[in-house]
Amino acid sequence: TDLVTNPMDYLNPAHPLLLISFGRSGNSPESVAAVELANQFVPECYHLPITCNEAGALYQNAINSDNAFALLMPAETHDRGFAMTSSITTMMASCLAVFAPEMINSQTFRDVADRCQAILTSLGDFSEGVFGYAPWKRIVYLGSGGLQGAARESALKVLELTAGKLAAFYDSPTGFRHGPKSLV
């Protein structure tokens, strides 16, 4: 969304650009506007939309464009839930597989899935919350640099999955100690 509100902070007409767009539906006004702005301001602009919706604008525009290649996720990942858990996971994993195939491939995906299943099995019954029934009211995720986005997305998922009943925040570790730590 920052790209749409401040395009010249991110788009440099003097350098080629590969814009990677993640969009479950591929129809959000921000996603479509980001593509249009990139095409408008950057002469050598290429697009890689990663989406779960074959009928979405991101996918349809890409298949009809000379400067785009779309990655369409399986239809089963086009989840309808507000938190988009399967779609974002599949889109992110697919992006990693495209840009780091020697590190992320079907075998590593299988290994991760097996490890996750082993962890879930070892944790036992989830009928009681992960932290018991403590009256938690807020959670803060910390991340800086490349992990700031993960902290932001984690906070958003908690907010969505609890329907706002648990206040979720994010910050950088050093930024958190200057005021926001008063949350805890």
Language-model regions, residue ranges each:
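Active-site phosphate/pyrophosphate-binding segments
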Residues: 63-184
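Glycine-rich phosphate-binding loops that contact phosphosugars or nucleotide phosphates
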Residues: 1-114
